[in-house]
Amino acid sequence: TMIDKIVPRPDAEIARQLAERGIEGMEILPRARGAAVAPFVNAEETQYLCIEDHYTNGRPPLELGGVLYCDRETVDKIEKMKVCTCLNPLHTAMSIYGCMLGYTLISAEMADEDLRAFIQKIGYIEAMPVVVDPGVLNPYEFIGAVINRRLPNPFMPDAPQRIATDTSQKLAIRFGETIKAYEARGLDKSNLILIPLVLAGYARYLKGIDDNGQAFEPSTDPLLAELQAIV
């Protein structure tokens, strides 16, 4: 199964806007370990759910609600398209540089022309030549929705600090697979300019100093202390 729908924790600004509209009882309630619950959910409009069609005695008609039924190989291809090319690499690139530039919202980063161009070029120019095409979803339509609808959405208050969590565990799959695909297909790796810049940016991020020379706290990561000792 592959599901793709970002649902951040309840946001105080969304609660305020709901209250302004006369909707009562929308208070956010803190929970253990920094979690929170609320009667509302701030989530994306765009959503994907792909399920392996491997039922023993019929299956519910979830396709009527937009669910994609496909074989296991296709589910894997959809996951690779998303994780290696069309969404997750862009997310990680934005999170690293967003933290260093003082952003706290992904949607605000998308208003920065340089950052927007940065992820567009990573996706369209460097990663798409080796994208895994699952057939049932168009990679260009998928990444177009990411850049033009999902990331700029101000009502989906996702933060670069959240996305930057465990970055050391994500770099290999989100960028290494593209580099390996270039090697396997005999493509010119010198065309990869911005993906190496993401990796260099991560080394800079690990220092915990933002673009104004002020200290910031990197997001939690199992290798944080080890990597900070190296850089």
Describe the predicted segments one by one.
Residues 1-231:
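Substrate/ligand-engaging "lid" and interaction regions
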